[in-house]
């Protein structure tokens, strides 16, 4: 999984 993508989702959630 992509790290920046995970961080992006974390920001939304």
Curated annotation (Swiss-Prot):
What is the recorded name of this protein?
Temporin-1Tl
Q: Which Gene Ontology cellular component annotation is one that this UniProt entry carries?
A: extracellular region
Instruction: Give yes or no: UniProt keyword Membrane.
Output: yes
The UniProt family comment states: Belongs to the frog skin active peptide (FSAP) family. Temporin subfamily.
The principal localisation class reads secreted
An annotated Gene Ontology molecular function: lipid binding
The protein's role, per its UniProt record: Amphipathic alpha-helical antimicrobial peptide with potent activity against both Gram-negative and Gram-positive bacteria, and against fungi. Mainly acts by causing perturbation of bilayer integrity of both neutral and negatively charged membranes, probably by forming pore-like openings. Also displays anti-leishmania activity by damaging parasite membrane. Shows hemolytic activity. Also shows cytotoxicity against cancer cell lines. Strongly binds to lipopolysaccharides (LPS) and its lipid A portion.
**Can you list the disulfide-bonded cysteine pairs?**
none
Positions modified as Leucine amide? 13
